[in-house]
Amino acid sequence: MRRMTTTPEPEAFLVLSCLGPDRTGLVAEVTHYLTERGANVEDSRMAVLGGEFGILLLASGPPGAIEAVERDTGALTRATGLTVQSRRTKSPESHRRAATIPCVISVDALDHEGIVRAVSRALHGAGVNIVSLETSAYEAPVTGSQLFRMEAHVDVPVGVSLAQLRKAMDAVAESENLDIEVRSLIKG
């Protein structure tokens, strides 16, 4: 008797962006929508900004499941009130760039216009890719001055030394009056 073997169906990937007024239950509703169609959350970022809740997630699943998620976004909008956009993408593994050094760049300063622009332009000029970036503004406990914090996870090409990156960040720190720390995530 001959055994039948089945090859696993290849996974498909989709980025889903959802934005709308913040309220309780949105994450539960969006993830239910995905699992009901056979898709899974691989990676996500979610935050309240002002009074709006934003969801950016990477969903995976068999091609038919991802097609159902794409096809039915109108149902998700009607059920949640969120503005929904989707875009097919490749697997995270196939996008990863070879030969990079993962680093974290932390910035602290008195808040003023142009901090993100100045840091991101310098990173771009050095050929460094921003993988994720988070910012926040807050009041200093005693003085009430508006402070700013930024943390960026970046991929530094092997051809760019950490000394070169630090030099580029030092120039931005000097011109913008920032405290910047560059830290490699590779131990050793």
Across the structure, where does each feature detected by a protein language model lie?
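A conserved regulatory-domain signal marking ACT and ACT-like small-molecule sensing domains
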Residues: 2-188
